[in-house]
A protein has these predicted regions:
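Polar, enzyme-active/binding microenvironments
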Residues: 1-280
Length: 280
């Protein structure tokens, strides 16, 4: 991935956020894909740099993977930093978790803490936002793309899952004073609900237009994946898209490179046209 292409993609993203009046709603965020190293992925777009607690698996095409057992990010932004009725939390999911866990949270570890924030999955997507009792079954647990919640009133929240926005009644409470974490939830010294999802973006801030944010983040992620695929065979790209659609998750960069090498090699050896049906 060339530096110039990365810069163009991120520049387009930031300009788009500003054009859509979203940029000032984001108070802490990381673009955790596209960079050559984990350190680059954890450089903040806005806000303080997050603290890495054990995360080590990084793919520049699809982001950082949790381990589902002990690793998480501390965003170093407190849940109280945004007003009670003016808040959003969002992640972009490249690969959903394999078990019940949270994407992004503040509090509620081991119980229903008033004023906590949780966005994660059990049988479906569940959400707390300045609340103790969660809303559940808001969307599929296997949903990829933007998963987000925004609150702009004391009475209701809006969630964004699988490209659809839904407004639900959920009374707000005074926000719990806890650091917002990604890949797990923490209350004091207790950390639980670790996730093995792969996440290339998170943001925290004031209430925002989730549909517009979804469009901008999805475009950025598509741009970064396209840069990774520069020079790929068109038939390899078509196959990659079909596999990702069937799996409901984005493929790791090494897998994409291997498949492209296979297709290109078959064509170089004049074998491709003789293959009428094939599965990997």
């Amino acid at each position: 991935m060339t530096a110039k292409a990365r810069i163009r993609a991120v520049d387009r993203f930031i300009k788009g956020l500003k054009e859509d009046n979203l940029y000032n709603d984001i108070n802490a965020a990381c673009v955790m894909a596209g960079w050559d190293s984990l350190a680059g992925a954890l450089t903040p777009l806005k806000g303080a740099a997050p603290t890495n607690n054990g995360l080590s698996v990084y793919d520049r095409g699809i982001g950082i993977a949790g381990d589902g057992s002990s690793a998480y990010l501390d965003s170093n932004r407190n849940n109280t930093a945004d007003p009670q009725n003016d808040n959003h939390n969002a992640v972009f999911v490249s690969s959903p978790p394999t078990s019940a866990s949270v994407y992004i949270a503040a509090g509620s570890s081991g119980g229903q803490q008033n004023g906590s924030n949780n966005l994660g999955v059990t049988d479906g997507v569940f959400c707390r936002n300045r609340s103790g009792i969660p809303l559940v079954s808001l969307g599929s647990a296997s949903a990829d793309g933007l998963v987000a919640v925004s609150r702009s009133s004391a009475a209701a929240i809006t969630t964004r899952i699988s490209g659809e926005s839904t407004t639900s009644s959920l009374a707000s409470q005074s926000p719990l004073s806890e650091e917002v974490t990604v890949f797990a939830r923490r209350s004091g010294a207790s950390v639980d609900f670790y996730s093995d999802a792969t996440i290339p973006f998170f943001s925290i801030g004031s209430a925002t237009d989730l549909a517009a944010l979804d469009a901008r983040v999805s475009t950025l992620m598509a741009d970064l994946r396209a840069i990774e695929e520069t020079g790929f065979d068109k038939d390899a790209i078509a196959y990659l898209r079909a596999v990702e659609e069937a799996d409901g998750a984005f493929l790791e960069t090494d897998v994409k490179v291997a498949i492209n090498s296979l297709v290109a090699g078959l064509k170089a050896d004049k074998l491709w046209e003789s293959m009428k049906a094939c599965c990997l």
